[in-house]
Amino acid sequence: LNSDPPRRARVPVSFVLINSEHGSDESVIEALKGALSGEEGVEYEMQGVYGVYDIVLRLSSDDAARLRSIITNKVRRIGRVQSTLTMMVIEEQGS
């Protein structure tokens, strides 16, 4: 009898730090919501933050290649996004 809790299936997760033009945080967040809302099977959450970056975006999907495509073809192409820093979570590490 195994008393270890069952392992949850891991899905690819990315955190994207976004720099936007000064004063455009809210409009970028709204544009992100519009761009991502039609993506079936993709979960996301975002928040404006203080510091070097303006917005933190968390994306998850069952396909890492799809996440990369969304970041490249949707997130980075939103007007007023000046730069991004993407961190793909290493699925084999952590809890």
Where do the model's predicted regions map?
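A compositional/biophysical signature of low hydrophobicity enriched in polar/charged and small residues
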Residues: 1-95
